[in-house]
């Protein structure tokens, strides 16, 4: 039982700690950036682009490869035909047979040479055997025994000129890496804007909750005062009913605000990766005045073109399409490469068909020159140029849209500042009106209905001021994002 209680305390304790901790806007931003899965994916895409760039850089270097093979054939390679083998094996026999016929003709023509010819004839068998042996040795020497063949080679290739393809491909991978980095920067700004909106929504509802409580307490006190006036005969039951209706409305408003605040906190927890039931407290929740120093606005839109991630991505895309034009052109330019290597075989090919591994070194140059392709290269290059032109037009259009978006964001930020000043002035008047109405109601010169109206105006003025303050914060974040510098 003690172990169970101890475990339960350990499980509940972190939630209590989270609930007690007060989070600032920067802390919420950092939490959201760390736990966001899409940002993790974009970071991995940067790593992939980096590896692609490094892989492209290796194309400048020589490539070394190893090749090997084994082959078993049903018959060996024969350098001699069967007739040639038979002729060589019986070379002595055939030669002595022809020689015997010639010697018989000599004896017929010159009988006196018969003893000499007879002595030579006795040597014919040994001569025939020796010559047959020599012929058979030639046949045996030309026996390849290549039914089992093994070959291996080490190859080296060094590109010398590829029509600019290697350099263009390196540029493409470099720009692709920069695009991935800009995507991550844009994704971070999107997450930060979501955090800012959720954060200030919680702050807004927390302030409205306090305002709703103050309004309800004000009506409860008024209800008590009216009941006392009724007992004194100064007020009527209708006055009490009016106050009661307003009090019920205030209770309903407070309930809605509290429910909205709970949902807003849960949304902020989801964005920041916190437990949904943690109910974090924010640093600005207790602040009465949320207005900050006005942000200086740029006089031109060039800053947005420089920092906006979307524009930077499109600029790099234009560079990529320009490099692709060179890639297409390089396919129809001469390609020059240095070749070298070492090859070995078994049986050896450099000393007959010797049964051992022997190899040879080799070095050379290869040149490939396209001669005629019916205009294919020209058409492909023009197609690549058209794609590059499309990318430029997309960039120009995006610049115009960004310029419009920045202008709109500036107007909204300026409008929010003006609304805040007006709401503060309106709040001062509403508070003064409420003070006068409360004093007059105590003196009996102001009716309950007029006091309720003054209280409602006070509530609306406070609510508008809270909305104006939050609107200033959010529009500033939106302007920063439009300029491409949110969170930087």
Where are these regions (language model features)?
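Amphipathic alpha-helical coiled-coil segments
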Residues: 41-56, 187, 193-210, 221, ...
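Periplasmic alpha-helical coiled-coil/stalk elements that build and connect Gram-negative outer-membrane
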Residues: 3, 51-53, 182-303, 412, ...
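Bacterial Sec-pathway N-terminal export signals of envelope proteins
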Residues: 19-78, 234, 276, 283-319, ...
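Small/polar, glycine/serine/threonine/aspartate-rich low-complexity segments that form flexible
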Residues: 68-154, 285-293, 339-369
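Transmembrane beta-barrel domains of outer membrane proteins
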Residues: 57, 157, 326-329, 366-368
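Sec-dependent N-terminal signal peptides
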Residues: 4-13
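Small/polar (Gly/Ser/Thr/Ala-rich) solvent-exposed segments
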Residues: 40, 64-78, 137-147, 157-186, ...
């Amino acid at each position: 039982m003690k172990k169970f209680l101890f475990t339960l305390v350990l499980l509940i304790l972190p939630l209590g700690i989270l609930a007690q901790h007060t989070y600032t806007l920067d802390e919420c931003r950092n939490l959201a950036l760390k736990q966001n899965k899409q940002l993790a994916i974009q970071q991995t895409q940067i790593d992939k682009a980096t590896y692609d760039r490094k892989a492209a850089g290796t194309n400048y270097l020589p490539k070394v490869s190893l090749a090997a093979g084994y082959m078993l054939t049903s018959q060996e390679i024969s350098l001699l035909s069967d007739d040639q083998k038979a002729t060589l094996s019986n070379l002595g026999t055939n030669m002595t047979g022809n020689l015997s016929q010639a010697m018989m003709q000599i004896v017929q023509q010159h009988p006196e040479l018969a003893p000499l010819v007879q002595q030579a004839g006795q040597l014919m068998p040994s001569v025939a055997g020796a010559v047959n042996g020599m012929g058979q040795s030639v046949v045996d020497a030309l026996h390849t025994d290549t039914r089992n063949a093994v070959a291996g080679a080490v190859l080296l290739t060094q590109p010398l000129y590829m029509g600019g393809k290697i350099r263009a491909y390196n540029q493409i991978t470099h720009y692709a890496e920069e695009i991935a980095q800009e995507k991550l920067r844009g994704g971070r700004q999107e997450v930060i804007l979501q955090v800012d909106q959720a954060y200030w929504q919680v702050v807004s509802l927390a302030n409205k909750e306090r305002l709703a409580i103050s309004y309800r307490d004000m009506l409860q006190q008024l209800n008590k005062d009216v009941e006392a006036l009724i007992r004194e005969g100064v007020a009527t039951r209708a006055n009490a009913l009016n106050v009661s209706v307003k009090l019920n409305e205030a209770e309903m408003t407070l309930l809605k605000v509290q429910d909205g605040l709970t949902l807003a906190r849960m949304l902020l927890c989801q964005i920041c990766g916190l437990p949904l039931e943690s109910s974090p407290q924010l640093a600005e929740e207790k602040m009465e005045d949320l207005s900050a120093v006005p942000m200086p606005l740029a006089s031109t839109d060039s800053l947005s073109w420089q920092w906006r991630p979307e524009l930077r991505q499109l600029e790099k895309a234009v560079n990529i399409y320009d490099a692709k034009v060179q890639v297409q052109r390089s396919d129809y330019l001469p390609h020059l490469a240095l070749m070298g290597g070492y090859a070995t075989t078994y049986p050896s090919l450099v000393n007959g068909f010797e049964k051992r591994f022997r190899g040879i070194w080799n070095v050379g140059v290869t040149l490939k020159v396209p001669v005629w392709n019916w205009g294919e290269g020209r058409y492909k290059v023009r197609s690549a140029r058209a794609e590059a032109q499309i990318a430029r037009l997309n960039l120009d259009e995006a610049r115009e849209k960004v310029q419009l978006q920045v202008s709109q964001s500036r107007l909204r930020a300026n409008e929010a500042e003006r609304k805040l000043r007006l709401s503060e002035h309106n709040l001062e008047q509403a508070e003064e009106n409420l003070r006068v109405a409360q004093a007059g109601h105590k003196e009996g010169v102001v009716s309950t209905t007029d006091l309720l109206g003054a209280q409602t105006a006070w509530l609306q003025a406070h609510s508008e001021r809270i909305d104006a303050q939050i609107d200033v914060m959010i529009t500033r974040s939106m302007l920063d994002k439009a300029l491409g510098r949110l969170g930087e």
